[in-house]
Amino acid sequence: MSKHTRVTSSETAINQHRSLNVEGFKVVSARLRSAEYETFSYQARLLGLSDSMAIRVAVRRIGGFLEIDAHTREKMEAILQSIGILSSNVSMLLSAYAEDPRSDLEAVRDERIAFGEAFAALDGLLRSILSVSRRRIDGCSLLKGAL
């Protein structure tokens, strides 16, 4: 192909199709009105997604697949970091108490309470993330709401 030869969009699509591993995937097509497509595509681009990825995210959400947003991920990481710190604190306090039973037992109790609260927060967050039936209901509600 010379450098002045123009590649058509269908050739580009064929070349992309050849380079992708499509094994295990099903191709789904949908007819959209021009305004629907333009709005959808614009929204996908704002999020940095291709049209295909945006459709896949929507399908996964409706199907109840696990998707964790950045805020939830940050919250989980903060809780896990807190649990790690609290665990170290409790361990150090218990070691100090074992060496000298006159050490501050109240500090051990306070750290233990905070540790339990952090675990409860993590448990609640994980339950909301992992609740398959709730995710499917949420996704189906989105779909029904769109109809």
Swiss-Prot record:
Keyword GTP-binding on entry: no
Look up keyword Cell division and say if it applies: no
A Pfam family (short name) is VirD1
Per UniProt, the keywords (alphabetical) are:
Crown gall tumor, Endonuclease, Hydrolase, Nuclease, Plasmid
- Reading the lineage from the top rank, the first entry is Bacteria
GO molecular function list: endonuclease activity
Q: What is its EC number?
A: 3.1.-.-
Job of this protein: Tumor formation by A.tumefaciens involves the transfer and integration of a defined segment (T-DNA) of Ti plasmid DNA into the plant nuclear genome. The virD operon encodes a site-specific endonuclease that cleaves at a unique site within both 24 bp direct repeats flanking the T-DNA.
Q: What is this protein called?
A: T-DNA border endonuclease VirD1
Organism of origin: Rhizobium radiobacter
Q: What is the lineage of its organism?
A: Bacteria, Pseudomonadati, Pseudomonadota, Alphaproteobacteria, Hyphomicrobiales
